[in-house]
């Protein structure tokens, strides 16, 4: 397993994750394959699954995990390995072009990709009836694309609005 920063020895109610996927989609253009490794060290799905996240989550915790559509199956595997049960897509980020304001056009094997999803999983003991603090948090986030792997700051704000200012770890 590649070296990684040890996880803090605390207990968290929210994990906000954008795993460093070793993304190698068959059929994608040569330009699109393996772009993450140009920006940061990546990990295989098995390596991400092996991170000791289970050890730092409280009972009834929530995980918000970013994934691209072709990688959703892998993201759900990681959630399960970390002790979470997939529930839904918490957020769908529609990437906007910074300069023209229209929709950003990314790469893709089948269609030109734009949106990314932030999946939601929970651990046993999560009580939506009492833990969800706001029922007006929208799923769609329209925000500019600001560079590889940079997610909209608005996502963090929506997580706090949804679940409150609880102990959370961004990884």
Give residue spans per PLM region.
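Class I S-adenosyl-L-methionine-dependent methyltransferase catalytic core
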Residues: 1-171
